[in-house]
Structures are given as structure tokens and as C-alpha cells.
From Swiss-Prot:
It comes from Schizosaccharomyces pombe (strain 972 / ATCC 24843). It is an enzyme of class 6 (ligase). NCBIfam families: MTHFS_bact. Its EC number is 6.3.3.2. ATP binds at K5, N6, Q7, L8, R9, G139, H140, G141, K142, G143, Y144, Y145, D146, D188. This is Probable 5-formyltetrahydrofolate cyclo-ligase. Substrate binds at E57, W102, H140, G141, K142, G143, Y144. It catalyses: (6S)-5-formyl-5,6,7,8-tetrahydrofolate + ATP = (6R)-5,10-methenyltetrahydrofolate + ADP + phosphate. Keywords: ATP-binding, Ligase, Nucleotide-binding. Belongs to the 5-formyltetrahydrofolate cyclo-ligase family.
Amino acid sequence: MSLKKNQLRAILNSSLGKLADHIIDSQSISICKQVVELPEWKRCKNVCLYMNMPKKEVRTRCLIDVAFKEGKNVFIPKCIGSHVMEMYQVFEKTESLTINKWGIAEPNGESRKIMDDETDCELIIVPGVAFDEKLSRLGHGKGYYDNYISKYQSWALQKESRANMFKVGICLKEQILPNREIPMDTRDQKLDALVTPEKVIRNI
């Protein structure tokens, strides 16, 4: 993990922490409207979403509500160890979520998870601290999503018939670095698409 990444995180976390709730809410609604129009969203049966932090990132309640309304199976992450997470299924009327040390709701780990019983993840919605227009992502530095995506891809490759995971980042306008590339290393996963409040950027 380079100093440059840490510097970017510090700068972005400081500015994002100052964003008013109404700005985050407005941008989150715009992002939700674009995500649910993606062809990958429309055709997926299983979708991996995330429960947002109290501040600093796109709010996902709208996406979760739409996914349930459309009859999709919804999976959200639970951190189960150092740099390790799993995606567990949650249900519309669930009361089994707990709050972790980062203030994020997560499942209790007792339901079905992706890769159990050949369960595919066709679409994963990925948070982050910063993004660039070349579909690079800067996370929080723990490697949870990079490690999980790598593990899923290895599993899907072995199974051959399993669905490829389409990776969509969602970000506030303030999280985009328009004139700067995020430093990447061999473990970092590129996105397939990035949805901002104003546009969709795809890996063509």
C-alpha cells in the first residue's frame, strides 16, 4: 500500500466528511435510477449490494428496495476476519442485521451465501473512497472487495458454467478524480462500469 494511496484516502475522507446529508441523498437517488436501468441489473437474479456507512458514500437503500421489489436475491457483505468477507443473503423483512465497528449494518452470517450450493453472483455493486474514469477504484485499504472478487472469479473459472461477476462501482461526484489516475497494484480489481450521478462509464 503506497503512501500515495494513503494521501488520496486522507484527502477524500476529509472532504467527503463535510458533505451535507441532502447532497448525498440527492446524488444517491440519481445513481440508483441509472443502476436499475443497466442491462446487467435487469437480467440478474442474484445481486451483491452493500449497506452504506453513515456518511461519506452512496446510500444504497433505494437499490436494495428496488431489488426486493423486482424479486431479486439480495446479498450483502459481512466481515469475518482480517481482509476477508462473505456475501450473505438478506430478506426484505430481515431483523437479523447487526452494526459492526464501522457503523455498518451486516447480516448475522446464518443465511445462504454466494458460492454456497452453486449460488452465482451475476452483479456486484462496489463502494470505494475514490474512482477514476479508467475504472480504477481506491478502497479503504483493507482489501475486502479485491480479495472477495478474486476468490469468486477463481471459483467461477473452476466451475466453467458459473456466471461472470459484473463489477459496478457507484460514486458521488466528489469521489471522482477526473484528471488523475488511481495507483493500482496487481491485487487491485478493475471495475466493469462506474455509475456517477451524471453518467455511466463502461469498459468498452
